[in-house]
């Protein structure tokens, strides 16, 4: 079974013969689609969270589709009208009333009963954009999402953000003027990346007048004293790093309604990856965030076991894997790190 965001679902046998296909509308999304279909019994389940609205409506056309694995026929669909684009693949969990489909997206973690897809519970607190896939183990669901913009820590260090913008200080006076916001300048989201990298900062319009207006707004937002400069103290004092909070939670499935206060056993707010999914092994959770920071968390208590910096820098986009007693972590720059599992 394969899913292409630009086409839909296809099914092949092991000789590569197409058995059926199901064209689907391409979800509208800033970054494209990344959710994979998952199988449950005779069903194939796909979540298509979407920025596009239903016809003549102000609510999203996001939905969960359940298809027959045999012929691609739609068995049921459940709309998610208040959800927008998301990139997390759902997972299956065993709740107190049976199996559940667990979906992370648009600020919340939600559980749907199987096989009928009825929504049962939700847990809140995540940022708008979530990518990692939830995990299950030890009778819990573990789900994670960084702060919007990629910040991994609740109390992020503001200095890298200042270093990213002061690099555009053309006259070298230690301050930034509006006229120095040239070239690849934008407000940084991920200061560990070079300016000009697609993930470095706030996307700017291509049209000159709109681009100028956006940069004017960025400058005025930080220049609170209106002296025509950003200096280090003013920038750091006025800096807001993303929206929402970086979050890893442990949730007991099987609840009803909003379970944020009743079934979330713990939350953790440091070293949360933006793109990679965490991995659970021997009651420990391992996470790698941008900049090459490896964080290990006790899965029962939600307490940090250790936090170490790897040799790689820049972005970490690949999810870690475990082979034997070794954790394998690959950076975007091509560095592969092997770390012994355990405390």
Annotate each language-model stretch with its function.
Residues 1-343:
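Noncatalytic, solvent-exposed loop/strand surfaces
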């Amino acid at each position: 079974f394969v899913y292409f965001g630009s086409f839909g679902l296809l099914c092949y046998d092991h000789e590569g013969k197409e058995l059926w296909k199901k064209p689907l509308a391409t979800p509208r999304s800033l970054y494209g689609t990344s959710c994979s279909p998952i199988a449950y019994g005779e069903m194939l389940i796909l979540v298509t969270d979407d920025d596009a609205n239903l016809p003549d409506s102000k609510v999203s056309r996001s939905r969960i589709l359940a298809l027959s694995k045999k012929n691609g026929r739609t068995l049921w669909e459940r709309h998610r009208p208040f959800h927008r684009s998301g990139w997390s693949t759902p997972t299956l969990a065993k709740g107190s009333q049976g199996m559940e489909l667990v979906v992370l997206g648009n600020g919340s973690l939600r559980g749907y009963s199987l096989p009928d897809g009825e929504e049962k519970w939700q847990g809140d607190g995540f940022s708008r954009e979530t990518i990692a896939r939830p995990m299950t183990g030890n009778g819990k669901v573990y789900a994670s999402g960084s702060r919007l913009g990629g910040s991994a820590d609740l109390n992020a260090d503001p200095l890298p953000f200042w270093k990213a913008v002061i690099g555009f200080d053309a006259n070298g006076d230690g301050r930034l003027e509006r006229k120095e916001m040239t070239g690849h300048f934008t407000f940084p989201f991920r200061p560990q990346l070079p300016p000009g990298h697609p993930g470095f900062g706030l996307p700017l319009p291509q049209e000159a007048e709109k681009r100028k207006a956006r940069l004017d707004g960025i400058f005025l937002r930080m220049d609170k004293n209106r002296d025509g400069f950003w200096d280090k103290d003013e920038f750091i004092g006025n800096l807001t790093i993303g929206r929402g909070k970086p979050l890893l939670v442990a949730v007991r499935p099987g609840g009803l309604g909003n379970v944020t206060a009743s079934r979330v056993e713990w939350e953790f707010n440091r070293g949360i990856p933006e793109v990679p999914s965490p991995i659970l092994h021997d009651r420990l959770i391992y996470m790698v965030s941008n900049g090459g920071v490896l964080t290990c968390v006790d899965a029962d208590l939600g307490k940090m076991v250790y936090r170490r910096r790897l040799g790689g820098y820049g972005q970490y986009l690949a999810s870690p894997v475990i082979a034997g007693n070794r954790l394998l972590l690959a950076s975007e720059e091509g560095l592969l790190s092997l770390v012994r599992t355990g405390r």
